[in-house]
């Protein structure tokens, strides 16, 4: 069995809907991944084992997904020097500001790259992981470049189609 390049670690199965666009992006880019459900607080030994063994398994990037206290990405980063991306899950507190701050406020020396809360966060985490992989994988880099070009063409097409032009004095 091929080792996954990316491992998603979710604090709860309720986080799954927030990463679907990200999973689709990795599939489109043909990047191998696995999804694990582990809690920094309820299964700390399993999180520790996953983090410590990720590199030897061939994993290149870890993505931690959590809401509320959202310690999972930081706990992953504390046990590995692999890149860790944190995805904050929206909560009732200011749309996930608590989650975002829990992930982004890491002490010096234990970095966690952090993306937006919500659906765009899951997709952007996948694309950031792909960008990291693309440094050493020309196929992934080319696919990302093509995706950006397609995105730009769609926006320019809508601009031309809608023809919205506002001029002022």
Question: Where do the model's predicted regions map?
Answer:
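Short glycine-rich or small-residue beta-strand-to-loop segments that form or flank ligand, phosphate
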Residues: 5-10, 34-36, 62-64, 85, ...
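Short glycine/serine/threonine-rich phosphate/pyrophosphate-binding segments
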Residues: 15-19, 44-47, 66-75, 94-97, ...
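Short, ordered loop/turn segments at secondary-structure junctions
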Residues: 13, 38-40, 67-68, 89-92, ...
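Glycine-rich phosphate/diphosphate-binding loop of Rossmann-like nucleotide-binding domains
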Residues: 3-42
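Glycine-rich phosphate-binding loop
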Residues: 50-88, 92
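C-terminal binding/interaction regions
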Residues: 4, 10-17, 21, 97-169
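N-terminal beta-loop-helix "entrance" segment that forms/cooperates
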Residues: 35-56
């Amino acid at each position: 069995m091929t080792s996954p390049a990316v491992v998603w670690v979710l604090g709860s199965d309720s986080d799954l809907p927030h990463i679907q666009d990200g999973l689709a992006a990795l599939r489109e880019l043909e990047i191998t991944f696995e999804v694990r459900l582990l809690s920094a607080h309820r299964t700390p030994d399993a999180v520790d084992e996953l983090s410590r063994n990720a590199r030897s398994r061939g994993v290149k990037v870890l993505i931690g997904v959590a809401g509320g206290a959202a310690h999972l990405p930081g706990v992953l980063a504390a046990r590995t020097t692999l890149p860790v991306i944190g995805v904050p899950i929206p909560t009732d507190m200011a749309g996930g500001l608590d989650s975002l701050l829990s992930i982004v406020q890491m002490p010096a020396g234990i970095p966690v790259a952090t993306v937006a809360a919500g659906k765009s966060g899951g997709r952007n985490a996948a694309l950031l992981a792909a960008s990291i992989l693309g440094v050493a994988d020309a196929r992934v880099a080319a696919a990302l470049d093509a995706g950006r070009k397609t995105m730009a063409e769609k926006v320019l097409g809508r601009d031309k189609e809608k023809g919205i032009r506002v001029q002022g004095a």
